[in-house]
Amino acid sequence: MKIRASVRKICEKCRLIRRRGRIRVICSNPRHKQRQG
């Protein structure tokens, strides 16, 4: 999980999701997981 100021999709399978007021990226590739700080 990378914590970043700006999250964006890295590949086609990345999905942007809002959870508990935070923006997250979930993907089938675990390296692409991100969360907005």
Curated annotation (Swiss-Prot):
Protein name: Large ribosomal subunit protein bL36c
Keyword Plastid: yes
HAMAP family given in the database record: Ribosomal_bL36 (MF_00251)
GO biological process, one term: translation
Entry GO CC: chloroplast; ribonucleoprotein complex; ribosome
Compartments it resides in: Plastid, Chloroplast
Family to which this protein belongs: Belongs to the bacterial ribosomal protein bL36 family.
Lineage of source species: Eukaryota, Viridiplantae, Streptophyta, Embryophyta, Tracheophyta
GO molecular function: structural constituent of ribosome
Keywords noted in UniProt: Chloroplast, Plastid, Ribonucleoprotein, Ribosomal protein
Native source species: Capsella bursa-pastoris
